[in-house]
UniProtKB/Swiss-Prot annotation:
F-type ATPases have 2 components, CF(1) - the catalytic core - and CF(0) - the membrane proton channel. CF(1) has five subunits: alpha(3), beta(3), gamma(1), delta(1), epsilon(1). CF(0) has three main subunits: a(1), b(2) and c(9-12). The alpha and beta chains form an alternating ring which encloses part of the gamma chain. CF(1) is attached to CF(0) by a central stalk formed by the gamma and epsilon chains, while a peripheral stalk is formed by the delta and b chains. GO terms for cellular component: plasma membrane; proton-transporting ATP synthase complex. It comes from Aquifex aeolicus (strain VF5). The keyword ATP-binding applies. The gene is atpD. PANTHER family: ATP SYNTHASE (PTHR15184), ATP SYNTHASE SUBUNIT BETA, MITOCHONDRIAL (PTHR15184:SF71). This is ATP synthase subunit beta.
């Protein structure tokens, strides 16, 4: 058994800890892990002890390293013993982690007892070699009409999720987890990066209620935690996802909420380490930091990791260096809008603002592409006509424009869909719509043969057959 290398704490400045290793041949490497025992007082005035992990960030002097703490540093004292882990912090992987919540160091934080993992993998792993990566473009069917038709996601792709509070990001995320688990037998990893603890707790409770928790791993580093935690928690989640991809051969979904907070934490860490900031105060290594995470998200010949990342845009400035560095990696953008949520159209995905670079005939086929572009054309024309309708009314429109408005309103409603995870709230059974059914249904709507059916028959249904059935129930002549 290798000898344990030990050092001692010589300086603590907030989340930065300097550790001295005297008489060692080789200092711990950058990104390697250290651990020590933190003694502190809890809310009730009782002393407690816990393991504090740290990550080596700099070598300063001959025997000294500067480390970033992966937890609070109150209670640390100069001279206390620090143990070198011999490599990066190791994270539990495998089916044993499903249904559990972990912190950045891979420790369970859900009070459900220890995790009996058979394998532990390092937090930092290199992206797959180019020869291991899959060059095949394979569309990931989500069963959600508006996504599959207008902004297709590919296996191993990266999707940016944009939307304010209360427009349905969480429910959309849960439905994707549900559909991947139920219809593709895949697993999901949810990574909370610098978001509200309350939201993390709510998501856990909602997942328990909707029955998707057994197929999910949750890794949290919330906004009340030190910057080191928020900066590294995405890597912890990716390590767990990589096991399912590389060993189990799974198509894994990873949700990162919020990727901007990862960049923000990196800026804090960079400042603490004394690096000169670059544009707008961000770290000089901004693109490298983002790239390290994004390059690990890819398809291999064994399986895939598909990422859906919530992106906060500071002050709605799309040219800010942080979102700009993230956009460079995205294949698709999903924009949720309050305007549609207020109309009761869920998922409230804006069909005109949302994009995918894989909505092209060479990837999705001619038929899919033509149907999607015609749907977008009609919705765009409807958007242009809305101002005229608001001022002059429908009567002033030409017959052709009236037909477009009527069809667009039906298409808009048809893009809504009842979700499985929302059944208990809506009372409507969830619908999973296969891609070929989505294309066929919209193709038939575009011909105009269903323009005579009431608008509400198109609302919250699956395929065109469901529309016809609903219209019959409403007493309409089909």
């Amino acid at each position: 058994m290798a000898e344990v290398i030990k050092g001692k704490v010589v300086q603590v400045i907030g989340p930065v800890v300097d550790v001295e290793f005297e008489g060692v041949k080789e200092l711990p490497k950058i990104k390697d892990g250290l651990k020590t025992i933190r003694r502190a007082i809890d809310d009730r005035g009782n002393w407690f002890e816990e393991v504090l992990f740290m990550e080596v960030a700099q070598h300063i002097g001959e025997h000294r390293v500067r480390a970033i703490a992966m937890g609070p540093t109150d209670g640390l004292v100069r001279g206390q013993e620090v143990e070198y882990l011999g490599g990066p912090i190791k994270i539990p992987v495998g089916k044993e982690v499903l249904g559990r919540i972990f912190n950045v160091a891979g420790q369970p934080i859900d009070e459900q007892g220890p995790v009996e993992a058979k394998e532990y993998w390092p937090m930092f792993r290199n992206p797959p070699e180019l020869v291991e990566q899959s060059t095949k473009v394979e569309i990931l069917e989500t069963g959600i009409k508006v996504i599959d038709l207008l902004q297709p996601i590919i296996k191993g792709g990266k999707v940016g999720l944009f939307g304010g509070a209360g427009v349905g990001k969480t429910v959309l995320m849960q439905e994707l987890i549900h559909n991947i688990a139920r219809f593709h037998e895949g697993y999901s990893v949810v990574v909370g990066v610098g978001e509200r603890t309350r939201e993390g707790n709510d998501l856990w409770l909602e997942m328990k209620e909707s029955g998707v928790l057994p197929y999910t791993v949750m890794v949290y580093g919330q906004m009340n935690e030190p910057p080191g935690v928020r900066f590294r928690v995405a890597h912890t989640g990716l390590t767990m996802a990589e096991y399912f991809r590389d060993v189990e051969g799974q198509d894994v979904l990873i949700f990162i909420d919020n990727i901007f907070r990862f960049v923000q934490a990196g800026a804090e860490v960079s400042t603490l380490l004394g690096r000169l900031p670059s544009a707008v105060g961000y770290q000089p290594t901004l693109n490298t930091d983002v790239g390290e995470v994004q390059e690990r998200i890819t398809s291999t010949k064994k399986g895939s990791i598909t990422a859906i990342q919530a992106v906060y845009v500071p002050a709605d400035d799309i040219t800010d260096p942080a979102p700009w560095s993230i956009f460079a990696h995205l294949d698709a953008t999903t924009v949720l809008t309050r305007r549609l949520a207020e109309l009761g159209i869920y998922p409230a995905i804006d069909p005109l603002e949302s994009t995918s670079k894989y909505l092209a005939p060479e990837y999705v086929g001619e038929e899919h592409y033509e149907v999607a572009m015609e749907v977008k054309r009609i919705l765009q024309r409807y958007k242009e006509l809305q101002e005229i309708i608001a001022i002059l009314g429908m009567e002033e429109l030409s017959d052709e424009d009236k037909a477009i408005v009527n069809r667009a309103r039906r298409i808009q409603k048809f893009l809504s869909q009842p979700f499985h995870v929302a059944e208990q709230f809506t009372g409507m059974p969830g619908k999973y719509v296969k891609l070929e059914d989505t294309i066929r249904s919209f193709k038939e709507v575009l011909t105009g043969k269903y323009d005579h059916l009431p608008e509400n028959a198109f609302y919250m249904v699956g395929t065109i057959e469901d529309v016809i059935e609903k219209a019959k129930q409403m007493g309409a002549k089909v």
